[in-house]
Amino acid sequence: MASPDRHFANAAIFTHSTGLTPNSGDAALYIKSDNKAYIKDSAGTEAAVGGGGTKTYAVFNANDNQPPATNFATLDTRNSIAILDFDDTTDESAIFLGIIPEAAVLGSGLKIRLIWTATTATSGDCVWDAALERMNTDIDTDSFDTAASVTTTTNGTSGVPNYSEITLTTIDSVVAGDGFRLKITRDANNASDTMTGDAELIAVEVRSAA
């Protein structure tokens, strides 16, 4: 039987040996300890296959909100786009429910990406919080893990979307296949939240932080 590290002219070699340098005209393809595929040419140059892009695990829009019983963001529309209005004086929240997909990489936590705009403001900062709950306890009681936050200055032109990203490392020990709830809150009473008027949440992305 031929060795898996055997060279063939102008061929891709599938190998477990990350230290292998292919012969001229060959390329080596292998999986590293981070479970990502890499390719190496005969000059020894290594590159991640597929560009090493991040993985999106869930996407939510305003209509996916399952609001809390009190202090909830209000469903609204803007130019027929569904949005959630978050007050500038009271902390209001939205909750989204999903399932962590198979083969999700969670060792570094999750990144929560928010797309939002201001109702009228063209200046000021908005503070957003994100908290995750693993759905493995009594659903009659909330059990969200510690929240993480981000502060973003709103766009200087009304109606232009802002993009805020929160790195969430406290993820309630969630694993692939688990149901989860994600709570998004505008921390309106935070001294760093200086934006006047509502913040309008358009969409939320949950993706790998790796």
Predicted segments, located by residue:
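Glycine-rich, low-complexity segments
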Residues: 1-16, 36-79, 136-164
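Short hydrophobic/aromatic-rich beta-strand motifs
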Residues: 23-40
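Short carbohydrate-recognition loop motifs
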Residues: 75-89
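Short beta-strands within extracellular/lumenal beta-sheet-rich domains
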Residues: 88-104
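Extended, low-complexity, turn-rich repeat/linker tracts enriched in Gly/Pro/Ser/Thr and Asp/Glu
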Residues: 102-107, 117-125, 136-138, 191-192
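Short coil-to-beta strand junction motifs in C2/discoidin
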Residues: 122-129, 197-201
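Cysteine-clustered segments with highest specificity for TGF-beta superfamily mature ligands
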Residues: 162-191
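Proprotein-processing/basic-patch segments
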Residues: 186-210
